[in-house]
Amino acid sequence: MTITRHARIDWDEQGNPRSHDFSDVYFSTESGLDETRHVFLVQNDLRRRFTELPVGGRLIVGETGFGTGLNFLCAWQLFDECAPVDARLHFVSVEKYPLSQGDLQRALVLWPELSRFADQLLGQYVAIHEGFQRLVFDNGRVTLTLLIGDALQMLPQLDGQIDAWFLDGFAPAKNPDMWTPELFAELARLSTPSTTIGTFTSTGWVRRSLNAAGFKMKRVPGIGHKWEVLRGAFIAWPEGVTSVPAAKPWFARPTPLAGERKALAIGAGLAGCATAQSLAQRGWQVSLLERHAAPAQEASGNPQGVLYLKLSAHGTALSQLILSGFGHTRRQLERLQRGVEWDACGVLQLTFDDKEAQRQKQLAEAFPESLLHLLDRRAAEVQSGIALNSGGLFYPEGGWVHPPALCHAQIQHANIRLIAHHQALELRRVDDQWQVWSDAQLIDSAPVVVLAGAADIKQFSQSAELPLKRIRGQITSLPQTGASAALRTVVCAEGYVAPARLGEHTLGASFDFNSVDLTPNVADHLGNLTLLQEISADLASRLEAADRPPEQLRGRAAFRCTSPDYLPIVGPLADREAFVQAYAALGKDARQVPDIACPWLDGLYVNSGHGSRGLITAPLCAELIAAWLDNEPLPLPRSVAEACHPNRFALRGLIRGGGK
């Protein structure tokens, strides 16, 4: 994979940014705001369209070339001025060379009238790395999905429909790759007959190429030094051009449900709380069912979880999910109290054997230094504050999180109602509603249910066939000492240890595939102390670990929940028996796609199987659930969403034979 690097900026005497790579300005130095508003807001008729949005309506803007974010901020300012209070703006923008946060801040200082919006953008402009990066503003009223990478690699991965296009990027003569028939075909693929487009260039071949892609473009008067600009609308795919084939039926989007926007999320751990938040921010009324007295009482209840990216150098679906999910979670954490609810202290993964050393070398070659970089032993000791036996790979944006704090923050929304002390045991479909029962008691009902209760969702007949498995894990808590306060970062080898939170260090964690007993045991405490010794004998000594009677150690045990391919299970559920019947032909010839709609269990979704990565994957997967439900652009590449889809297991079973 290619390493995304930041834009190289040259600054003129007035403080205006200029691209070093493309030898072009990011915006007009004479009339930047006026030009942006005229070319993109006026030509797409956004004032009227924002004003006329219906109750709960939304408008989706697509952009080629995020640059300094000026177009986004101007669109947000106009939306804030004239859209209904419950309307939403979703802005999707592709950018090959994102500005660093420092350069972005320096550029946006030039526009003081946008400072209210620019400050919010800068506050969330962290962990911007390769792939799909989602940023959320104003309690979900405004969403920004950045596609970081080459436009012709990123746009084909986007699944969604755009209402208005901002065709930007540097001038065609400076950046011809952004003005090709192939790119215009992608814009057409993502458009509908009501989609509009505006661009600053009036070059004849650009107009003709857009027309050939299915748009109808015309020149209109420009502003400032721009005599003319282009505006247009998507009409239809031209004759002789084949439209993009639909998704395979088992991965197609279910028809959006009409009527009451009410949902039930079952399970108030990380997955359930994040799902409730994502839906509530879109205007859904959400009941969050939890069998315990409060959220985050099981695997999400540990005092410290590590924000650690176990990546692949080969761009796998899991690696893409982790990179996008990490950024999304990291931005959510910016709203929590640092030092108590989370800390961006970094994560150091030690080079504990030759195989790990080779893996780390490959990762360091595949990803930018701002995400991860190698440290030799001496540098690792300086970074961590303790003596070590080796160097390792350092993730400067990582750290630790108090998961219950994140869960509680996610459900602080007027649209979310927590129903505690209720254990959902059965789902029944009655009159387009899902009823949730506990023995003879009807707990609640709604047209939509999201199963977020880890492996416990297998108790429902509708999800019983999902191949989820439990893995018991135990952590150990050790009191901070004067000497252990030197630890400055999370350090991992086979286990992990975190800097102290409220006077206690967390270390762990055990993996037990067989035990179902959640009582902390001495054997696992001893195992965790061994992991600590392997990480750093110096830190073990500082923590006086050898002097602590194992039977007096405090800790906590819970079940992780994972799938056979270690990807989470996220998306709409189908009727398993009807699915096997509908697509039985795949068992004979996997290349033949039956023209049969997927037998969805309308309104039933799952967000589970996050394993030990829930902090990183669950919040973004909640956004994926919301996108499925509300027919929004997906927050992940289509291929990654399909890799996480619940239907993947039944599909593999059919192709391999046996329908399992």
From Swiss-Prot:
Q: What is its main location?
A: cytoplasm
Matches recorded under HAMAP family: MnmC (MF_01102)
Matching InterPro entries: FAD-dep_OxRdtase, FAD/NAD-bd_sf, MnmC-like_methylTransf, SAM-dependent_MTases_sf, tRNA_MAMT_biosynth_bifunc_MnmC, tRNA_MNMC2, tRNA_S-uridine_synth_MnmC_C
Its function, per the record, reads: Catalyzes the last two steps in the biosynthesis of 5-methylaminomethyl-2-thiouridine (mnm(5)s(2)U) at the wobble position (U34) in tRNA. Catalyzes the FAD-dependent demodification of cmnm(5)s(2)U34 to nm(5)s(2)U34, followed by the transfer of a methyl group from S-adenosyl-L-methionine to nm(5)s(2)U34, to form mnm(5)s(2)U34.
Q: What protein does this entry describe?
A: tRNA 5-methylaminomethyl-2-thiouridine biosynthesis bifunctional protein MnmC
Subcellular location as annotated: Cytoplasm
Q: Pfam families, from UniProt?
A: DAO (PF01266), Methyltransf_30 (PF05430)
From the UniProt record, list the reaction(s) this protein catalyses. Answer: 5-aminomethyl-2-thiouridine(34) in tRNA + S-adenosyl-L-methionine = 5-methylaminomethyl-2-thiouridine(34) in tRNA + S-adenosyl-L-homocysteine + H(+)
Protein family per UniProt: In the N-terminal section; belongs to the methyltransferase superfamily. tRNA (mnm(5)s(2)U34)-methyltransferase family.
State the residue spans of region: tRNA (mnm(5)s(2)U34)-methyltransferase.
Answer: 1-235
Which PANTHER family has this protein been placed in? Answer: SARCOSINE DEHYDROGENASE-RELATED (PTHR13847), TRNA 5-METHYLAMINOMETHYL-2-THIOURIDINE BIOSYNTHESIS BIFUNCTIONAL PROTEIN MNMC (PTHR13847:SF283)
Enzyme Commission code: 2.1.1.61, 1.5.-.-
Q: Give the required cofactors.
A: FAD
Name the segments for region: FAD-dependent cmnm(5)s(2)U34 oxidoreductase: 266-660
Q: Which UniProt keywords apply?
A: Cytoplasm, FAD, Flavoprotein, Methyltransferase, Multifunctional enzyme, Oxidoreductase, S-adenosyl-L-methionine, Transferase, tRNA processing
The record's GO CC annotations read: cytoplasm
Q: Which GO terms describe its molecular function?
A: flavin adenine dinucleotide binding; oxidoreductase activity, acting on the CH-NH group of donors; tRNA (5-methylaminomethyl-2-thiouridylate)(34)-methyltransferase activity
Q: Which organism is it from?
A: Pseudomonas syringae pv. tomato (strain ATCC BAA-871 / DC3000)
> One biological process GO term for this chain?
methylation
Q: Does the keyword tRNA processing apply?
A: yes
Q: Keyword Isomerase on this protein?
A: no
